[in-house]
C-alpha cells in the first residue's frame, strides 16, 4: 500500500487516533491543538479573486493544513473584481496584517504566488508549494488528502473527477460542472469512490422549514409556482466575440486555463470574473446565484426531471450599412432573461412550475402587495399556491404570508442572522466535511444530494443558448423536440483533457 493510502486510512480510523500516544514529540501539538499529523492536508486549486477570498476560511480551520496552491497564473496585479480594494482589505483582516502588500492599493492581486504568500504568512513558515498544473500537483504531492476547487466553472468537473479518482476528498464552488453530463459523471464518481465531498452553496442556503410548514398546513392551498429573481448579472455579458488578440500576460498559462475547452486566442474578456457570462466557461447567473437560493428548495420539494424548460431572453440588434439586424449569439448569456421549468407531480406534491428571473426581470406585483402598499425588492423568492402566497428573501430568509393580515395567527420566524465579516467564518458545512474526511458521515452538502439543482442550472444554459422551449426526457438525458440542443448537454473535450485522461 502506498504511503498516501496509509495516511488516509490512518486519518479515517479510531486505531489511528489511538496511535498518537507513540508519535514522536515533534509531531505533537501544544495542549488543546490538533497534532499536525492528524490534520487534513489540502491543496487549494484556483487563486483568482474568489479563490483568494475563500482561502482564509481554510486557513482558520483547525482541522486543515493548506500545503499547496495551484493556478495557471503565477502573479498578476490587474485582476477584475467587485471593487478595487475590497479583496485587499479582506485578506489583510484575515491575516491580521494591516500592512500586507503595502503600497499595492488600487490594484487587484491574484495568482498562485499571492496564494502561497497568504498561506506562508498565516502559518509563519515557507512550507506551501505552488503549481501551475493540477496534474503535476497530484503527481508530485500524492500524500495530499483533499482539494478545494475555486477555478472558473469549466474546470470544476475535470479537476474534481481527477482528484476523486486518486482518492482525494473534494470541496468545490458552484457549479459542480457547467455541462449536464459532466455534472452527472462528477456525482457518479463521488458515489463510486466514496470520498468525502462538499458543495459550497449549501453553506449559504436558507431554511425551508417554515415555508414547508405553511405549505403542509394548507395556508396557501396547493403549491403551483415558485418564483426566484436576482439582480445578476453584475458583470459584462458580451454580445460579440473578441476580435483583437492581445498578448498572453507573462506568467499566465493560457493553455492550462482553457483546460477541456477548445482552443482560441487569449483575451482578458474571457477570464477573471467575466468568465461567468460565456457558455463555454461559465454557467450564467443561475449557476452563480441559483445554487444559493434554490438548492434547499429542490431538496425540500424533491424537484428533478423537468419536462419542459422555456426561455425568454433579451436580444441584441446592430446596424450594418444602415440596416438593422439581429445578432446571432450562441456563445454568451443574454443580458436579461426569464426561464420557466415545469416539474411533474411527485409523491404527495402536485406539478410545480419554477420560474427564474435575472437581469432586472421579476414577476408582476401581485394584488397582495398592492393591498399592503408594498413592492418587490431587487431579489426575492415567492411561493404561489391556489389559495395564497408566501414571500421570502432571495435565499428563503424571513418568509411571510402576504398580504400582511394573513400573518395573524401565523407567528413570523426569527429574522435571519447575519454573520459579522471581521473574522473568517467557519461554516458548519466545512466542519462537517472535515469530519467526513476523517471517516464521519457525508456533509449535508455532499455532491450526492446536488443532482436536481445541477440538472436545472445546466438545462437553463441549454435553453438560453438555443432560444427554444425544450422538452426533456430526464430518464434518458435527452432533449426530445430539438435534437441540435443535445450537443450542449455534454462537452467535447480537447485532447488530453477528458475525464479518462486527467
Where are these regions (language model features)?
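N-terminal glycine-/serine-/threonine-rich beta1-alpha1-beta2 phosphate-ribose binding loop
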Residues: 2-168, 184-196
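Non-transmembrane alpha-helical segments in soluble domains
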Residues: 11, 55, 70, 116, ...
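C-terminal helix-rich "cap/oligomerization" subdomain common to oxidoreductases
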Residues: 12-35, 332, 435-502
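Hydrophobic residues in well-ordered beta-strands that form the structural core
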Residues: 44, 172, 197-199, 392
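Glycine-rich, aromatic-lined ligand/substrate-binding cores of catalytic
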Residues: 47, 250-435, 441, 455-461, ...
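Short, solvent-exposed loop/turn elements at domain surfaces
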Residues: 50-54, 76-79, 140, 235-237, ...
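Short, solvent-exposed turn/loop segments enriched in Gly/Ser/Thr/Pro and often Arg
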Residues: 73-76, 131, 150-156, 176-178, ...
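A contiguous active-site-proximal alpha/beta segment in oxidoreductase catalytic domains
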Residues: 169, 177-251
Amino acid at each position: 500500500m502506498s504511503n498516501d493510502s496509509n495516511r488516509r486510512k490512518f486519518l479515517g480510523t479510531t486505531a489511528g487516533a489511538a496511535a498518537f500516544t507513540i508519535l514522536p514529540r515533534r509531531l505533537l501539538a501544544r495542549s488543546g491543538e490538533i497534532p499536525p499529523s492528524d490534520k487534513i492536508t489540502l491543496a487549494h486549486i484556483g487563486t483568482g479573486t474568489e479563490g483568494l477570498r475563500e482561502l482564509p476560511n481554510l486557513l482558520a480551520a483547525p482541522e486543515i493544513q493548506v500545503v499547496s496552491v495551484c493556478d495557471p497564473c503565477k502573479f498578476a496585479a490587474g485582476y477584475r473584481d467587485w471593487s478595487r480594494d475590497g479583496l485587499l482589505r479582506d485578506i489583510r483582516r484575515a491575516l491580521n496584517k494591516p500592512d500586507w502588500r503595502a503600497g499595492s492599493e488600487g490594484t487587484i492581486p491574484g495568482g498562485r504566488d499571492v496564494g502561497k504568500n497568504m498561506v506562508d504568512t498565516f502559518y509563519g513558515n515557507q512550507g506551501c508549494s505552488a503549481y501551475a498544473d493540477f496534474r503535476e500537483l497530484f503527481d508530485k504531492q500524492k500524500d495530499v488528502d483533499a482539494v478545494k476547487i475555486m477555478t472558473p466553472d469549466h474546470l470544476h468537473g475535470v479537476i474534481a473527477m481527477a482528484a476523486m479518482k486518486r482518492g482525494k476528498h473534494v470541496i468545490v464552488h458552484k457549479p459542480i460542472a457547467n455541462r449536464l453530463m459532466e455534472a452527472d459523471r462528477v456525482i457518479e464518481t463521488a458515489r463510486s469512490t466514496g470520498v468525502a465531498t462538499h458543495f459550497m452553496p449549501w453553506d449559504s442556503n436558507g431554511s425551508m422549514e417554515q415555508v414547508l410548514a405553511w405549505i403542509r398546513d394548507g395556508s396557501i392551498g396547493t403549491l403551483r409556482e415558485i418564483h426566484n429573481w436576482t439582480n445578476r448579472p453584475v458583470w459584462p455579458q458580451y454580445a460579440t466575440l473578441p476580435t483583437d488578440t492581445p498578448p498572453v500576460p507573462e506568467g499566465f498559462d493560457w493553455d492550462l486555463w482553457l483546460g477541456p475547452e477548445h482552443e482560441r486566442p487569449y483575451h482578458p474578456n474571457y477570464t477573471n470574473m467575466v468568465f461567468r457570462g460565456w457558455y463555454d466557461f461559465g454557467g450564467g447567473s443561475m449557476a452563480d446565484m441559483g445554487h444559493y437560493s434554490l438548492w434547499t428548495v429542490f431538496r425540500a420539494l424533491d424537484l428533478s426531471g423537468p419536462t419542459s424548460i422555456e426561455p425568454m431572453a433579451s436580444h441584441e440588434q446592430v446596424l450594418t450599412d444602415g440596416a438593422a439586424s439581429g445578432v446571432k449569439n450562441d456563445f454568451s448569456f443574454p443580458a436579461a432573461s426569464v426561464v420557466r421549468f415545469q416539474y411533474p407531480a411527485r409523491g404527495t406534491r402536485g406539478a410545480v412550475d419554477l420560474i427564474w428571473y435575472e437581469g432586472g426581470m421579476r414577476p408582476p406585483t401581485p394584488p397582495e402587495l398592492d393591498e399592503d402598499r408594498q413592492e418587490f425588492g431587487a431579489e426575492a423568492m415567492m411561493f404561489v399556491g391556489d389559495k395564497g402566497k408566501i414571500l421570502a428573501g432571495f435565499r428563503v430568509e424571513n418568509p411571510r404570508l402576504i398580504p400582511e393580515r394573513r400573518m395573524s395567527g401565523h407567528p413570523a420566524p426569527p429574522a435571519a442572522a447575519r454573520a459579522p465579516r471581521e473574522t473568517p467564518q467557519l461554516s458548519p458545512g466545512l466542519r462537517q466535511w472535515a469530519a467526513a474526511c476523517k471517516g464521519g458521515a457525508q456533509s449535508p452538502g455532499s455532491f450526492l444530494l446536488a443532482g436536481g439543482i445541477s440538472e436545472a442550472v445546466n438545462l437553463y444554459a441549454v435553453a438560453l443558448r438555443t432560444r427554444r422551449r425544450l422538452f426533456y426526457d430526464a430518464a434518458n438525458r435527452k432533449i426530445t423536440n430539438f435534437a441540435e440542443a443535445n450537443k450542449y448537454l455534454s462537452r467535447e473535450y480537447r485532447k488530453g483533457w477528458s475525464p479518462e485522461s486527467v
